[in-house]
């Protein structure tokens, strides 16, 4: 269809348009349909309409084509042409409106028209200027058009999400498919209304509401799915971090446990670093390297040690004898602050050597106790032909007692092996060894303090009752026939050889410590013994503050039947507890 630029009439073909122009406009007087301009030919009228009234003339004729440009349906070349014409028309129309003089009713001719020469001369110049300016703006228009087309997206239905090609199709879709939603509910009517529980939209149909809510749920499920994926990833990461932390913790615990185990092995001499012989040789070599021992002395001592180990008898190089006799003389002639003192039977002091330094206190205390028993005729039957054994021999004797069936729990703890190790021994091993020799003894466990500040006054009272059967009427110095007492606490052991009672009734133990070297003990052998020399022997109540103490006290000789009974009882080892 073709439309006449002058009157707007539409014809079906180009020949019809030519006939229309000839008959209607060229043969008759041409009059502007907008401003009544007349007296011009056809070409001039077309130019006038194109420049002065293009917007009014094209508004209805190009409405559809302009919409097509806005929705991006036409090709780029046609869109650019139409957009350019629309811009030109708008600008020319505004230019005409601003530049042409206002025409009042009095200035118009009686027939209501304007002559060509009155109008043409005023607007022709402005029209030509505008056409030149539009040529410069055409390139900008094309750029704007491409940007607009790039940013455009097809319209989407707000109810169901369907996408249409243009706004007219979308409007048709909404009117046909969602007409119920477009109706405004009437007041005071009985029509049921359905509110969306999520966004508050009012629907007149339950099925429409259901579709609308389904859209909400789809969006929500998508978001929840994303959240679930994220949560799953977070949970997986948290589990990995927890597993890594647990692995590191277990590894650290295993490392610390191994270090503690190795420390205990070294502490108790079970680290396979050798026993008495190896340590003796190693320490003597160190002394030679430091210049403290001559090589000839090293070889002499090594030979003596090998001989001692071969016969199983202590070489006596760490022994100090005669101390008990020296103590008796001292208390008889001095010690004015002492009310009464009880001394054990004769006993030799043994101290640690290069071979057992740091772990041999239990063995040295046994040597002290055995040295006293060997001087007592009451134990000759049990200790017939025995001498004070060396430390490796004592280890062998304890292993033999385990083999007889004594203290299986203790044997298991030490892997049934003492020889060739630096394993410590305590009250249980001393009891086991003495019982296997048919020496009657008892273990008393002072498992907790019985006095203020962690002291053990009950321990002192028990030792006093052991040595002093009758305190009143006895002389100041009492030399008893009782053997010394083995005294054990955590990490160390000593031998109790007597007890003092001060004039203020306080008690003080006299103990031999295997950690005290011979040169210090020999100071007690002097006739003019000083009080300061006794300081290393005296232990008051306030000096013994360990949490637990155990003592092994000898009480006589066992018969063969009693030995068997005690061996059976040692299967589950128990001790007398005080308190």
Curated annotation (Swiss-Prot):
Its EC number(s): 3.4.19.12
Location of the region described as MIU in the Swiss-Prot/TrEMBL record: 227-249
UniProt-recorded name of the protein: Zinc finger-containing ubiquitin peptidase 1
GO cellular component: cytoplasm; nucleus
Keyword Metal-binding set for record: yes
Classification of source organism: Eukaryota, Metazoa, Chordata, Craniata, Vertebrata
Compartments, record wording: Cytoplasm; Nucleus
Pfam families (alphabetical): Peptidase_C78 (PF07910)
Gene3D superfamilies: 3.90.70.130, Classic Zinc Finger
Zinc finger annotations (C2H2-type) as residue ranges: 2-25, 30-53, 155-178, 194-216
Domain of life from the UniProt record: Eukaryota
Cross-referenced PANTHER family: ZINC FINGER PROTEIN, ZINC FINGER-CONTAINING UBIQUITIN PEPTIDASE 1
Subunit structure: Interacts with RPA1 and RPA2.
UniProt site positions, description: Involved in the stabilization of negative charge on the oxyanion by the formation of the oxyanion hole: 488
PROSITE patterns cross-referenced by the UniProt entry: ZINC_FINGER_C2H2_1 (PS00028), ZINC_FINGER_C2H2_2 (PS50157)
Modified residues annotated as N6-acetyllysine in this record: 263
Enzyme class, spelled out: hydrolase
InterPro entries documented for this protein: UfSP1/2_DUB_cat, Zinc_finger/UBP_domain, Znf_C2H2_type
Biological role: Deubiquitinase with endodeubiquitinase activity that specifically interacts with and cleaves 'Lys-63'-linked long polyubiquitin chains. Shows only weak activity against 'Lys-11' and 'Lys-48'-linked chains. Plays an important role in genome stability pathways, functioning to prevent spontaneous DNA damage and also promote cellular survival in response to exogenous DNA damage. Modulates the ubiquitination status of replication protein A (RPA) complex proteins in response to replication stress.
